[in-house]
Amino acid sequence: MVSGKIVKIAGPVVVAEGMKGAQMYEVVKVGNEGLTGEIIQLESDKAVIQVYEETAGIVPGEPVEGTGAPLSAELGPGMLKAMYDGIQRPLTAIEDATKSIYIPRGVSVPSISREAKWDFTPTVNVGDKVEAGDIIGTVPETKSIVHKIMIPNGISGTIKEIKSGSFTVVEPIAIVETENGEEKEIIMMQKWPVRNPRPYKEKLPPEIPLVTGQRLEDTFFGLAKGGASAIPGPFGSGKTVTQHQLAKWSDADIVVYIGCGERGNEMTEVIEEFPHLDDLKTGNKLMDRTVLIANTSNMPVAAREASVYTGITIAEYFRDMGYGVLLTADSTSRWAEAMREISGRLEEMPGEEGYPAYLSSRLAQFYERAGRVACMGHDEKQGFVCIVGAVSPPGGDFSEPVTSNTLRIVKVFWALDANLARRRHFPAINWLQSYSLYLDDIEDWWKENTAEDWREIRDEAMNLLQKEAELQEIVQLVGPDALPDKERVILEVSRMLREDFLQQDAFSDIDSYCSPMKQYTMLKTIMTFYSKAILAVEKGADPADIAKVSVKQDVAKMKYTPEEEFLNKLAPAIVEKISKELDALV
């Protein structure tokens, strides 16, 4: 192994000499305490190292030892329900081992417990041919998720021996004989370099929407399975609650939640809340299918980059089993700030607003690892990783580099608006600024699962909301009574859309999740009201009378009505009442 000594220290960046033979992105142990670091630059025999722990107290002359391996994630049973820091050190295990409320420097605890035993049930037999990605057995990791044990990358051949029973993650469970007669032992744990995307057979088109149960996100700005989305918004606009809602209700099997440089108390909220939340899909706890990566703002900045790559590697591992994974990163801006700080320490040429010139390529490397794929292996498995990245632009300025570079990469943009949040309109996603480029891809799915006219109704409702925004400027100057009758109807129906459809109560048992069919029926009902109201106005009805009809109260009750009762009883009754009351005005 390469061994050198420290010549310079600048915050999280350390320079060591005598490092000839070291490799880029190799993990090294820095100083007498053996702090974890990663080589990010090599020049002759000097190595520039970013250190993932606090460097205070280290002095020039202390040793630097190479490990010969890149920064890698340990992947295997025991990750679900776990809480890691940015470099996949298990926080609960560190607390148990050190009895400290802080992470001591240089502490080394395996990411996955070597003592815990897991019940392994084989799904292949001796003599079966296997290749990388094939599932050879299962482990019931939690009540919600069955962990599938796969053949590691680079191994293929014939099963010579396979066991059944309780094993630790490092005990051999099978032996594979390769084509050249070599015998390879298979254990339940794999290691994978976090900067390298895991392989797959092919990427599949994003044709199926990720149903989140949130009306605004699903109906107007849908995210496809395997897609990437950004949630930019200023402080207090509801980024974290929006991400919690997605984690709770999305039709993904597994959630990886990365708290990247966020406040400690926000991460504490997640850690306290998630273990108590019930997962209505499985009936178990939400934590049973969640991996938490807590990397708060007071932890060393270099670890923010590692936390993002560690999170996406864990997500890809579960994707390779054929699961759907939702990865939420809160917030990518803090990672970009860490890049800016380290770039400054390296004395690199700054780009826009001091961020490094490679900001956009690093963001792209991360977001491009999302996707719906045909997984490796003989069996026809499909899995997906969806990325939802929160962005925290200073002062809510969407033109700043992190937001603008993110928007070039992702196809869904949910713009949070502080003004909507102040008016208590939640989710505070601004429907005039947001967009989704997946609409054409997921349109067929919506038509098959709701109705043929889904797209027309959705587009018509969107046009009304845009017209309302144009009319609001006139209304503020001269009042609504000066508008033509049809435009007064547009204002009234747009208000119904905003209050009775777009607003959603995250704390209501009924309204917290809204199925695609209920979403379509609610929107169709409001648009039926609009078309009947326009006809009534053309026949001479007064818009003031239309605004007073009692059926509007029934429309307001739609979201708080259980789905079955709404679809079978309330919706047909409302449509009938709309015709009756509006016809009576003519």
Curated annotation (Swiss-Prot):
Gene3D superfamilies: 2.40.30.20, 2.40.50.100, Bovine Mitochondrial F1-atpase, Atp Synthase Beta Chain, Chain D, domain 3 (1.10.1140.10), P-loop containing nucleotide triphosphate hydrolases (3.40.50.300). Its EC number is 7.1.2.2. It is a peripheral membrane protein. Its main location: membrane. It catalyses: ATP + H2O + 4 H(+)(in) = ADP + phosphate + 5 H(+)(out). Keywords: ATP synthesis, ATP-binding, Cell membrane, Hydrogen ion transport, Ion transport, Membrane, Nucleotide-binding, Translocase, Transport. It is an enzyme of class 7 (translocase). ATP binds at residues 233-240. One of its GO terms (molecular function) is ATP binding. GO terms for biological process: proton motive force-driven plasma membrane ATP synthesis. SUPFAM superfamilies: C-terminal domain of alpha and beta subunits of F1 ATP synthase, N-terminal domain of alpha and beta subunits of F1 ATP synthase, P-loop containing nucleoside triphosphate hydrolases, Single hybrid motif. It is found in: Cell membrane. GO terms for cellular component: plasma membrane; proton-transporting two-sector ATPase complex, catalytic domain. HAMAP family: ATP_synth_A_arch. Has multiple subunits with at least A(3), B(3), C, D, E, F, H, I and proteolipid K(x). Belongs to the ATPase alpha/beta chains family. Component of the A-type ATP synthase that produces ATP from ADP in the presence of a proton gradient across the membrane. The A chain is the catalytic subunit. This is A-type ATP synthase subunit A. It comes from Methanococcus aeolicus (strain ATCC BAA-1280 / DSM 17508 / OCM 812 / Nankai-3).
